[in-house]
């Protein structure tokens, strides 16, 4: 073997050993009550998948809620005797993601409650409410 190949082999061996030593859990106890959490790859992968699922659900739900007509939703709630008191807080991505229970999603917004691109008289909102609609927003767990 040439000297360069030997140096390369030693360098790779040193990197390999340092990687093994760095990721090995330490079970020594030095006077204090210390413990080591052993992280399993399956638990980490499941937690990452759950976080991605929750984030995707929150983003999709926020996009659906951003397209809702809040005035129509509140008026429908008052007509049914159960005020919703929904308020538009601007883009709901961060706000809704923070308040969203894990793995909950807004299933569908009734087309009646979607924003209209056409305004009423003098640019006001024109809302036509179909009181036969039974569900405005449905949350799944």
Curated annotation (Swiss-Prot):
<dbReference type="GO" id="GO:0042600">
    <property type="term" value="C:egg chorion"/>
</dbReference>
<comment type="similarity">
    <text>Belongs to the chorion protein S16 family.</text>
</comment>
<feature type="signal peptide">
    <location>
        <begin position="1"/>
        <end position="22"/>
    </location>
</feature>
<keyword id="KW-0964">Secreted</keyword>
<dbReference type="GO" id="GO:0005576">
    <property type="term" value="C:extracellular region"/>
</dbReference>
<comment type="function">
    <text>Chorion membrane (egg shell) protein; plays a role in protecting the egg from the environment.</text>
</comment>
<keyword id="KW-0732">Signal</keyword>
<protein>
    <recommendedName>
        <fullName>Chorion protein S16</fullName>
    </recommendedName>
</protein>
<dbReference type="Pfam" id="PF05836">
    <property type="entry name" value="Chorion_S16"/>
</dbReference>
<dbReference type="InterPro" id="IPR008450">
    <property type="entry name" value="Chorion_S16"/>
</dbReference>
